[in-house]
Amino acid sequence: MDTMDKLQFLCFEFKNFAKNRGPMSSLSQLEQDLKQFRALPYHSDTQLAQKLSEVQAWQRGRIHKTHQALFASANNQAMGEFLIDQLYGGEKFNVLAEQLERMVQKAEKLEKFIPANAVSTGAAGIIEAINAIKLDLQLAQYLQENHLSVDEPSMIKAYRSVNAESARRQQIADLKQMCYRTDKYLKSFILQKAFSLAKSTAYKKGFQPLYDFIAEGFAAIKPIKSIGAFIEP
């Protein structure tokens, strides 16, 4: 049995094993979120883009500081960096989103060689990153409109003024769910094998950005001994 036959067999077995939604619903949602992301005003406003970048940098520093003990563990460092870089990645995420916009038009081909749950998990992670940008953009807009710098007193004012507490709580809940889902699928030998075999095909078909994003998430979460201890307060 050659590599392609193995890949098709494992994907078939995984589809029988998995009962969750296929990739198309997740990718359809991702396509809509990418369109909304591209329409965000900071793409055409350099001053607002700079303010958002400063807000994201502040958020990265805050998270590193408040979770210093958690990230100090060697097993947790990779996942901590992955979450922070993806949620507050700035220009790095802009490049990824641009690549994904071109890729998602051909999304129906994905189900032929990448396990559905791996794709849906990757799509969920990107959607979470877009949601984080939307929330931080609200803060950046407030700071810009009120001519405030990005520091702790100003950020406290911005958080209170924007009053997006429920949206922030939902963001945390969705992020936890994504982490649990990723951890669950990572424990599946069938998914891991099928996903690994799909790499060369994914690259050849032009799906490298999404494949690499999923692979980075899997690699980051793998060393964690207890995902519950990592994400629950």
Task: Name each region found by the language model.
Residues 2-5, 16, 20:
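Intrinsic-disorder-associated, low-complexity terminal segments enriched in Asp/Asn/His/Tyr and depleted
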Residues 25-233:
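Extended, well-ordered protein cores
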